[in-house]
């Protein structure tokens, strides 16, 4: 999702000398393949957006997979970038790197000041390792590698898998299927009280290109909207946009995850960047994308 959004944005502003490989063409978890790609193609700038991602269910069930796969991807790409003279690299992390009970909104300085959320600890530790590797290379070797921490993302080419998706795409799929099947209720994990922030993925792509052009430094930069919504409020928004007429039921026996996740985006704002897509418009665009994927899958 993120990689395709960055490509769309780069092309829209006139870049056409892009080196692109799908996961089928290049397995980033295999060091030899990654090194061969970098030594042959010699890219000058790298956006490292590849990752194994998932929601609470997937992270809870497969923590070893999430840690191993993400560590391998990050270390292989960053290491190959250094050894092959990449001029600048942007590493995309996640807001889950911050402590579970960090002061809100979460500033970049909150990193490693407390315990992580248990349900996605493995993924968070992998992401922290990636940003720290960039930091250490900058300090030791004089590289220009920057780390960007986006909030929760959604938009075109999202993952709508019933077990492995994040909350917003999962809600889109669940309400759509309930509408199509005329089901009386839709069940949602937890209490609905956790607060979350959401950023449309094309806005993140715009921010990444802005930072690649305008920021150099060893400090992490948060990317978000600075606005939050409860899971309960989000569910109602998605329900209305999808057009589902039934009821919402909350399964309080299931985990909520982190109670609140709002990023402090003051550093990015001071650099001169602002998001453009509000949540309602973004969910409408995401639902249109979901429908187009569903139609293609049926053909």
Residue ranges with predicted function:
Residues 5-13, 177-299:
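C-terminal substrate-binding subdomain of Rossmann-fold SDR/epimerase-dehydratase oxidoreductases
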Residues 11-36:
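Adenosine-cofactor binding site in Rossmann-like domains, unifying the SAM/SAH pocket
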Residues 27, 97-99, 122, 146-170, ...:
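Flexible, glycine-rich beta-alpha linker
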